[in-house]
């Protein structure tokens, strides 16, 4: 099984692994990466807004958004790898024997436990994406009007991370 550090991966290598038969990365990691991409667009809008006279009244807000978005981006990348960590043991369950009733019962029990464990990371990704949506809403209202379409794309990435 290939493990990949999402933050360190080349885009091409990550996409190749994502499109392979390997169980990880998968949808959870991809949704976290979508969150990180949307976050990056939010940071871009902040940087396009900072230092502009027209947006001087929003300078402190922009600095706060920048700090929060940097934190969220790191969390998205960490969650992409964490998703692979918690999904790998679940994927191994499919290889457990299930010839006898005892084996079937054991496999079912272990799969249920690992499914529960694996479900927490996607929930965290959704929570972070929802938090990011709040910041993106503020950026749409207070950020550079020249970058409002970038905020819109960031919102779509956040929605992808939630779905």
Question: What is each model feature region?
Answer:
Residues 33-37, 65, 72-79, 118-128, ...:
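Amphipathic alpha-helix face/heptad-repeat signature
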Residues 20-41, 147-162:
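Conserved phosphate/anionic-ligand binding catalytic regions in large, soluble enzymes, centered on
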Residues 83, 87-156, 160:
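Amphipathic alpha-helical interface segments
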Residues 44-56:
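Transmembrane signal-anchor/signal-peptide helices with a preference for the extracytoplasmic
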Residues 6-24:
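Short, hydrophobic/aliphatic alpha-helical segments
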Residues 1-4:
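Short, Lys/Arg-enriched N-terminal segments with co-localized hydrophobic residues
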Residues 15-18, 34, 41, 45, ...:
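Short alpha-helical scaffolding segments that buttress acidic/His motifs in well-ordered protein cores
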Residues 53-92:
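A structural-propensity feature for long, helix-poor, extended segments
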């Amino acid at each position: 099984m290939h493990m990949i550090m999402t933050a360190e991966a080349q885009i091409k290598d990550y996409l190749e692994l994502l499109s392979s038969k390997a169980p990880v990365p998968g949808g959870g990691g991809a949704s976290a990466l979508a969150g990180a991409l949307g976050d990056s667009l939010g940071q871009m809008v902040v940087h396009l807004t900072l230092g502009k006279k027209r947006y001087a009244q929003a300078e402190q807000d922009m600095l706060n958004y920048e700090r929060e978005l940097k934190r969220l981006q790191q969390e998205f990348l960490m969650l992409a790898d964490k998703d692979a960590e918690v999904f790998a043991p679940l994927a191994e369950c499919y290889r457990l024997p299930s010839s006898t009733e005892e084996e079937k019962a054991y496999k079912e029990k272990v799969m249920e436990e690992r499914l529960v464990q694996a479900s927490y990371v996607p929930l965290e990704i959704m929570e972070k994406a929802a938090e990011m949506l709040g910041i993106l809403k503020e950026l749409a209202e207070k950020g550079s009007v020249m970058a409002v379409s970038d905020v819109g794309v960031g919102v779509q990435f956040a929605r992808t991370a939630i779905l």
